Amino acid sequence: MKNLNSNNTPTAEQLNNFFSTIGQSTHDKVQNTKCSPKEFLSKIPIKNSKSLFFRPITVDETRTYIRRMASKATQDIYEISSNLVKLVAEEIICPMTDIVNSILQQGVFPDKLKIAKVCPILKRGNPTDVDNYRPISILPTFSKIVEMAIAEQLISFLNKNNYMTDAQFGFRQNRSTMDAVRSLFNYIAEGFEEYFITSVQYCDLSKAFDCMTHSIFLDKVEHYGVRGVAHSLLSSYLSDRKQCVHHNNKISSTTSIRHGIPQGSILGPLFFIIYMNDLPANLNCHTVLYADDTTLAVRDRSMSPLQDETEIIISEAALWFQTNKLCLNKEKTKTLIFSSSRRDTFSGSATFLGITMDARLTWREQCMTLKHKLHGIVYAIRRIRHIVSPEAALMVYYGLFHSRMIYGLELWGGSCHVTEILISQKVAVRAIAGNDPRCHCRPLFVKYKILTVMAELAIKLATGVYKDKSLFSKRSDRIPYNIRTKEDLTLSRHRLDVTQRSNLALKLYNRLPLEWRNLSETKVRAKLRAHLVDVPIYSLEEFQINPG
């Protein structure tokens, strides 16, 4: 719907109509299949008949849930903010606990807690076009407390019974976007070592969170053991949800939401990863999920069978998406072929969770793309430096430049192209100081206590070993007699440069002082940061000469 209003912006009513029907309209585009979602669920066998029973929560748990809420002054439909709830927490904590326990016991989510206040935010472009607005949904503040109680017990039940797929990295404890990217990278790199060509499908789902079909979701959780009162509560939570739009000091009428998960909710992301949970079990490929971001990878030693396998995987995935009423955008779904052989002429790149991989894993595209973004930030620092202090410019640097610079560094930092990022960082530091472009940078890194990109890389790699140290063997395990390097971890052998980079972390760990190796990861990181702030390094070789 375009240009709904001749005035500057659409009305609250027009925006509400658009937001409330977008999930339905996308859902209706998906044609029915002869399959049932339950057929796909059969690939996840249930080894026991355990059911989820919500236990009553304690006053202390309610207090913890209130403390966990983000401190915000934003008011919900009832003009209640989380700041207000935190202010009066001790006065309401006992009755709130009773209310939550009543909901858990009866299996009914109150209708008053299912009304969302939606505030539209203009994303870009023409302000008269409703497509250019992003809905920001504000749920009743008290509903967050109930949701935390439900989510905690539901997650515990699923994890205890080992129902959640290892392929899902989104909205799960101790898992991150980098873990997801690393899973894909390792699969491709391991294939390189064994002379495999890898085909990766980057699937694009249209409005996935808005399209989740409630009845299909409820069948899925029932399969996992959410039955009886617990099942009724989840059904009650999703049904009869409503929203109204607040825009330009006007409030729209209230409309019903029949599809999708509530934006801004605690339970919504958890519900969605449960919805996607049986996809990997139905595909014979390496699957990496981060919520709705889906990559499917297959590999073979020759191109002809790889193409056949790729077509089969795409077809099977498309059937799963269609049967589960999710809209696969085939125009935006991308295929990229990875190969280490120079005889292959594959090219191109694709971005997954903010990290760009090229067909040979050289990381050139990632570094060049990042360099371009960082140059724009340096320009902004230069402009503001004329009117603010170096301390203020330093805050801008950390907020915009440094955070982008170190994202995914442990993956792409070992490439030769990382020097381009170091050059950009030097330019940024000179801009903070307001110095001449040709001035020496090491004193500036020390003065402002900024870690170089190579220092950040050394810290990430060396401390990263601590998480999986038990997986590596020591040299003393293989050599029976006493040697000086007996406490060093054994390096693995690799055929290619791209896979040999995995040894970088072990090499850096082996250079750490012996007395550090039994310390915690946190303490070692602190020691390295304290050392490398005073001794800026421009290469990993410098770190190996003087690690601490």
What are these model-derived regions, one by one?
Residues L52, N249, I312-S315, T323-T351:
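Short, conserved micro-motifs composed of acidic
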